[in-house]
């Protein structure tokens, strides 16, 4: 085998798998009169670093990284003002004590590690960052193995008492969310619980439908009241950087295949001339 072909195949083996991510491209199932929570995030989960109008993000996304022994959020989100005037520091000489305190605070902010999870291998809900666009409407990119927990919206109750959850799994070669078994009826109504009750698809937008409740209580099954802070999960939208990365990986793979074909063709012609 020619050295060039061997090098390209080694390059494909090393680089191309890194371009493939086990991301759940669809949102978790939406149930009528129900909402879901996420207690902890799988390693690989990403959050869009969205900023308010007049500010731009430093990093495109914040990612949960780590392994079974340690996990944390990488690339914390920061928003810088797009106005030069706001970025200018006023030329005011601070008092010595204020200067030392400010210097210590700045150094601490720069060296402070990302938020760590209580449970290794997972990350908790990160705190809001300064100038975040809408903390209650963050855009999450879930990964394989992520589980979300469902509960009925305020004013509704579940017919069954068993936990209702959905997990992103590999099903028939595709990443899909499992169907949660939950049926919610209005409080005061009488209904018969059934283990075979199928989840109802949401055909309208009733109160609490399709909402997202982040929580920092990892590993617990006690739901907060629906009146707590909630966040609507926006439609999954790839960031521009992610689209560019996917396009680059596709172009790279096509180029490698083309070069491999050309190398094989040249080798074949060379062998034919020798014969």
From Swiss-Prot:
Residues 22-243 are extracellular. Residues 22-81, 121-186 form the Sushi domain. Keywords: Disulfide bond, Glycoprotein, Immunity, Membrane, Receptor, Repeat, Signal, Sushi, Transmembrane, Transmembrane helix. Residues 263-275 are cytoplasmic. Disulfide bonds join 24-64, 49-77, 51-79, 123-168, 152-184. One of its GO terms (biological process) is immune system process. It is a single-pass type I membrane protein. The keyword Membrane applies. InterPro entries: IL-2_rcpt_alpha, Sushi/SCR/CCP_sf, Sushi_SCR_CCP_dom. Residues 88-130, 188-221 are annotated as: Disordered. It comes from the Eukaryota. Glycans are attached at residues 80, 109. GO terms for molecular function: interleukin-2 binding; interleukin-2 receptor activity. SMART domains: CCP. It is found in: Membrane. One of its GO terms (cellular component) is membrane. Non-covalent dimer of an alpha and a beta subunit. IL2R exists in 3 different forms: a high affinity dimer, an intermediate affinity monomer (beta subunit), and a low affinity monomer (alpha subunit). The high and intermediate affinity forms also associate with a gamma subunit. Receptor for interleukin-2. The receptor is involved in the regulation of immune tolerance by controlling regulatory T cells (TREGs) activity. TREGs suppress the activation and expansion of autoreactive T-cells. This is Interleukin-2 receptor subunit alpha.
